[in-house]
Amino acid sequence: MRFYNTLSKHIEEFKENEPGIVRMYVCGPTVYGLIHIGNARPMVVFDALRRYLEYRGYRVIMVQNFTDIDDKIINKSIEFSVDFKDISETFIAEYWRDSMALGVRAPNFSPKTSDFVPEIINAIQNLIAKNHAYVVDGDVYFSVRSFPRYGELSHRSIDELKAGARIDLNEKKRDPLDFALWKSAKPGEPYWKSPWGNGRPGWHIECSVMSTKLLGTTLDIHAGGEDLIFPHHENEKAQSEALTGKTFVKYWLHNGMIKYTGDKMSKSTGNIFLLREALKKYGADALKIFFLSKHYRSPIEFSEKALSSAAKAATRINETFLRFESEFSFAIPKQDSWINEKRSIFIDSLDDDFNTPRALALIFELVNSLNRAMDDGNERDALKIYHLLRREFCPVLGLFDLPERADNRSIEELVKILIDVRAELRAKKQYELSDMIRSKLRKVGIELKDMPQGTTYTFIKEV
């Protein structure tokens, strides 16, 4: 198994720290609004990576944080005259709602910054004691020049970073690149007591503390969007390694951005398409196909055309599964060389820097083969293909999850009853009632098709 490591800028063989266990940290959202499809890409990609690691036999311990102390959250709480926790807790709940609708599994741990303030204060005290941080008027800053390897992750020297990076110009700091570990409280802001006075944690220190407290000193994988490489991940790496003297992360994985009208999709600019709107219009599987059809490190240009195409592909696959389930049995096929060959192709694809486009291409190829096998009445081959798709390949990528399909069985039985009722109405020439049933079903996303051999149905997304 090989991954492109942002730190080395090379594809490297994956070797976990502790045999059989992968410790994985993914940067989560700052919770001050509803998430958009740009936020959803790392959710889908790294959920699929976690599933694949488990498929390959690893035990994965995954942590994804919530940043619930931040200027944007505080500003919104002031705007609406509510406590900052009312804002953060509201949007954490909305995040879980969207995450469940998308079919992304919850991480093992979902820490919030506000729950780790004592540990953050302790870490800052240790950095001060090691001469990596200094106090100015109640603020605490990390001294970038105290850490010679600063810039390793973003592959830029300190002078290059000073010339072109987004840095906070502040007269209190000894160096413009130095960053805040602790911010002194301003009037009306939430605060915590500390040795340096009332204040709150800076952005970067929270991830270092939460990740190492929950996963240990050295993480196997740290993942997030490429926009976090600098300054966030660079700063995380510096302060963590300055604190422990050990390697913070073995493999840094970063996904490409989603472009919307040519620019990065971002809440702060308003250049967004909300995830729940996309889910309502296209469905979870269409969005996952859209994300996974591009290599995770490549940018994706958002377009209605691309999402519509992904929705059609999802419908086609779903209809194929429905057809098999209505015509054939669910026996477990015997393993043979053909199954092992396809499984090897799937594994080789994802072992190669998690190449989901190649894995998806195999899934699409097998869906076509499954339809041909059913057309030919070849139950043996159909069963083998269905098993690989339904029980192995699709679940690994989080597609067409079985729990969701199991919940749909009662819906499918009800639709069949309505089709029978409608057939009786048509036989009695009660066409107005028959058409009403068709119309009502279409409004809830079910389209009936009257064929010479009888009525069939499909699930549609845009109604």
From Swiss-Prot:
Locus of motif 'KMSKS' region: 264-268
Transmembrane segments: none
Broadest EC class assigned to this enzyme: ligase
NCBIfam families (UniProt xref): cysS
Compartments it resides in: Cytoplasm
Motif ('HIGH' region): 29-39
Assigned keywords, A-Z: Aminoacyl-tRNA synthetase, ATP-binding, Cytoplasm, Ligase, Metal-binding, Nucleotide-binding, Protein biosynthesis, Zinc
Secretion signal, residue range per the UniProt entry: none
Matches recorded under Gene3D superfamilies: Cysteine-tRNA ligase, C-terminal anti-codon recognition domain, HUPs
Cofactor(s) this protein cannot do without: Zn(2+)
Binding site for Zn(2+): C27, C207, H232, E236
Protein name per UniProt: Cysteine--tRNA ligase
Chief subcellular location: cytoplasm
GO BP term, pick one: cysteinyl-tRNA aminoacylation
GO annotations of cellular component type: cytosol
Molecular-function annotations in GO: ATP binding; cysteine-tRNA ligase activity; zinc ion binding
Similarity field: Belongs to the class-I aminoacyl-tRNA synthetase family.
The keyword Ligase is assigned to this record: yes
The enzyme's E.C. designation: 6.1.1.16
Subunit (UniProt): Monomer.
Cofactor-binding details, from the entry: Binds 1 zinc ion per subunit.
HAMAP family: Cys_tRNA_synth
Pfam families per UniProt: DALR_2 (PF09190), tRNA-synt_1e (PF01406)
Keyword hit for ATP-binding: yes
Encoding gene (name): cysS
Protein's organism: Pseudothermotoga lettingae (strain ATCC BAA-301 / DSM 14385 / NBRC 107922 / TMO)
Reactions it catalyzes: tRNA(Cys) + L-cysteine + ATP = L-cysteinyl-tRNA(Cys) + AMP + diphosphate
Sequence positions that bind ATP: K267
